C-alpha cells in the first residue's frame, strides 16, 4: 500500500504535465498519448533506481540519521509540489515535440523520484518491485491524465500537485515517527 501511495505521489508532476498537454492538444491520437505516458513512466521507474544506487554509496556514513534525511527529502519535495500548484505556468504542448523533448520533460518531472530512490537505500525496500510499480502507476495515470486534460484542463493540474505533495509529506512524517517510536 505504501509503495502505491508513493508511486501516486511521484507521478503527480508527470500527471500535471499530461493534463496540461491534454488541455492544450485536444487532437491527441491514442499513439501520441501512449508515447508520452511510456516515456514518463520509464523515466519515473529508472530514477528511483539511480537514486538507490547513489544512496548505497554513502548509506554507511549516514545510517544513524537516515530517517531525518528521508523525512527532510520527502517533506521538502511535498512542500515544493504544493507551492508549485499555486504558481502553475503555461506549459508547452509536449505532444508535438520530439522524443528528445518529451524525455527532457520526463527527466524534469522525475527528479523527485531520484531523491526518493536515495531514501530506498536507507530502508528495507524491494527496489526492483518498487521501481516497476512506480513506473507502471505513472504510465497508467499519465495515459488517463491526457484524456482528462482534454475535458477538465487547468483546474485539475494544480489539484494533482497539492495531493501529491500532501502524500509525500505524510510518508516522510510516517518514516520519522516510526523510527522515533521504535527507538524509545
From Swiss-Prot:
It is found in: Cell inner membrane. InterPro entries: Mntp/YtaF, Put_MntP. GO terms for molecular function: manganese ion transmembrane transporter activity. GO terms for cellular component: plasma membrane. The keyword Transport applies. The chain crosses the membrane at residues 39-59, 65-85, 102-122, 132-152, 161-181. Keywords: Cell inner membrane, Cell membrane, Ion transport, Manganese, Membrane, Transmembrane, Transmembrane helix, Transport. It holds the Pfam family Mntp. It is a multi-pass membrane protein. Signal peptide: none annotated. Probably functions as a manganese efflux pump. Belongs to the MntP (TC 9.B.29) family. This is Putative manganese efflux pump MntP. It comes from Campylobacter curvus (strain 525.92).
